[in-house]
């Protein structure tokens, strides 16, 4: 099986390169896939460096590499990369405007953690990112999260936050929020953690 992956990787198949990395055939394959523009490889490589992997002369060089790969993944349309980049910016006092952009974009793509972050911020529970308050959308998105099955923190947060949000809203606003949730579910991708096929 690995021989096929090697053949495909040598032909430029970035998925095969990631397979080789997961099969512990070397970090070089993940680096090649990232350099070739594979957004999953880019966010994985950024995460690997952030966790202390790889060798860098200075911490500053490591941070530049982390930022480079998270940004590349985000700009390539990867919702996981978007959230990793938004978190990187938040942890490093980055622009709140840019953080808001990536959180909202990842939420619109269905990333569960992004939807949770976006919903709590627009509902001001709390508003760490300075979003304008939108209780209807915040409740609607929180409701969608609360309906998820299978575990995870976001659904639990959703179920816990709904009553808090309801206290701040009129019955008409809650009804409007339920319609918002229906419309969002119809017009956006299904909510997902975007778990990688070959690893974590």
Give the residues covered by each predicted segment.
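Alpha-helical solenoid scaffolds that mediate protein-protein interactions
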Residues: 8, 33, 72-73, 106, ...
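Structural signature of tandem alpha-helical TPR/SEL1-like repeats
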Residues: 22-29, 55-69, 92-102, 132-137
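Short helix-capping/linker turns of helical repeat alpha-solenoids
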Residues: 6, 10-13, 35-39, 51-53, ...
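N-terminal leader/linker segments that initiate helical-solenoid repeat arrays
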Residues: 1-22, 200
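TPR/TPR-like (Sel1-like) alpha-helical repeat modules
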Residues: 68, 101, 131-156, 175, ...
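Terminal, low-structured helical/coil segments at or just beyond the last alpha-helical repeat
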Residues: 153-200
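Inward-facing hydrophobic residues that define packing positions of alpha-helical scaffold repeats
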Residues: 30, 45, 70, 85-86, ...
């Amino acid at each position: 099986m690995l021989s096929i992956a090697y053949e495909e990787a040598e032909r430029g198949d970035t998925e095969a390169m990631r397979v080789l990395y997961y099969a512990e055939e070397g970090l070089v394959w993940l680096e090649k896939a990232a350099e070739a523009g594979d957004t999953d490889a880019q966010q994985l490589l950024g995460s690997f460096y952030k966790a202390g992997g790889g060798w860098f002369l200075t911490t500053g060089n490591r941070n530049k590499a982390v930022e480079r790969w998270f940004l590349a993944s985000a700009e390539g349309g990867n919702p996981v990369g978007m959230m990793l980049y938004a978190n990187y910016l938040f942890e490093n006092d980055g622009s709140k405007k840019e953080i808001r952009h990536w959180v909202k974009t990842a939420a619109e793509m269905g990333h569960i953690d992004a939807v949770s972050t976006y919903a709590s911020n627009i509902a001001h529970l709390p508003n760490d990112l300075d979003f304008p308050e939108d209780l209807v959308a915040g409740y609607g998105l929180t409701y969608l999260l609360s309906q998820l099955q299978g575990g995870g923190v976001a659904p639990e947060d959703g179920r816990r936050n709904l009553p808090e949000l309801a206290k701040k809203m009129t019955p008409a606003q809650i009804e409007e929020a339920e319609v918002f949730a229906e419309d969002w579910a119809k017009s956006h991708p299904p909510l997902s953690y975007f778990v990688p096929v070959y690893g974590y």
